[in-house]
Swiss-Prot record:
(6S)-5,6,7,8-tetrahydrofolate binds at S121, L122, L123, P124. PROSITE patterns: GART. It comes from Burkholderia cenocepacia (strain ATCC BAA-245 / DSM 16553 / LMG 16656 / NCTC 13227 / J2315 / CF5610) (Burkholderia cepacia (strain J2315)). Attaches a formyl group to the free amino group of methionyl-tRNA(fMet). The formyl group appears to play a dual role in the initiator identity of N-formylmethionyl-tRNA by promoting its recognition by IF2 and preventing the misappropriation of this tRNA by the elongation apparatus. Keywords: Protein biosynthesis, Transferase. It catalyses: L-methionyl-tRNA(fMet) + (6R)-10-formyltetrahydrofolate = N-formyl-L-methionyl-tRNA(fMet) + (6S)-5,6,7,8-tetrahydrofolate + H(+). CDD domains: FMT_core_Met-tRNA-FMT_N, Met_tRNA_FMT_C. This is Methionyl-tRNA formyltransferase. InterPro entries: Fmt, Formyl_trans_C, Formyl_trans_C_sf, Formyl_transf_N, Formyl_transf_N_sf, Formyl_transferase-like_C_sf, GART_AS, Met-tRNA-FMT_C. Belongs to the Fmt family. One of its GO terms (molecular function) is methionyl-tRNA formyltransferase activity. GO terms for cellular component: cytosol. PANTHER family: METHIONYL-TRNA FORMYLTRANSFERASE, METHIONYL-TRNA FORMYLTRANSFERASE, MITOCHONDRIAL.
Amino acid sequence: MTHTLRVIFAGTPEFAAAALAAIHEAGFPVPLVLTQPDRPAGRGMKLQASAVKRYAVEHGMTVAQPPSLRRAGKYPAEAADAIELLRTTQHDVMVVAAYGLLLPQEVLDIPRAGCINIHASLLPRWRGAAPIHRAIEAGDAETGVTLMQMDVGLDTGAMIEEARIAIAPDDTTATLHDRLAADGARLIVDALVRLERDGTLPATPQPADGVTYAEKIGKHEAALDWRKPADVLARQVRAFDPFPGGVATLDGAAIKLWAAEPVAARGTMANAAPGTIVEAAPEGVVVACGSGALRVTQLQKPGGKRLPAREFLAGSPLAAGQRFALPDVD
């Protein structure tokens, strides 16, 4: 089916690319795609295009990559050029998903139907940059995707629609991301169909209660503090997969932990100091925590690959009594 509603799309990572693909495949014209500039990535630190740019180029879409959309920012000339491009590109609505750049009021006012954001949380919980990570880390039972009419605040716009999903006990940010991306893609296509048909999308202001913020994930958060309860550390490991990983330091080597589950402390395990390896078996490496213990079932040594505990121990033996370092506490 071919639609007449013209959509400018702004987004950067895979989460956004799923939405762009759905919009394109549904038959909506996309006269312009905005995405962040290419960034150095990988071991060779070569410039790499975003997932959104790769999809857009592959499908013959016009792409712009301004470093900023704020005239008062570090790149006023580039911002002015991008804003002029938005003004001269005929369109009806802008869809924004994990774009990574702030949209000033001047930009929000350009599309006739405004700017619709796809946000990976149940707003107003987890406004901000890392809603998927923080939902898992906090032990939330459910999360979802919210469509909102954007304003200049940080994810404060009126809500158009949401979809809820349960967070499974073994969900990682990677697995939850993929399900949320699919839901976001479905929601935005449905919303655009209604917007084209009705000319408007009713929206409800966000409640004042229940606001939390999902701060951007920093590499400094990767270090596991074994003084914490085992269930908290297990959530951290799941939340930080695929980035930045949970890091445990042993004899100066940073070992990444990719899969772990809390287990009850039994016998002498209950008296072991936090960070102490109490068992190193093919089924997993069990480490004493502030309360309970953590069975680690997937590990990665520096420069190596993710391996099940059995394979990791075959090449890098660990033994009961060894102790992972405790990070400094601010």
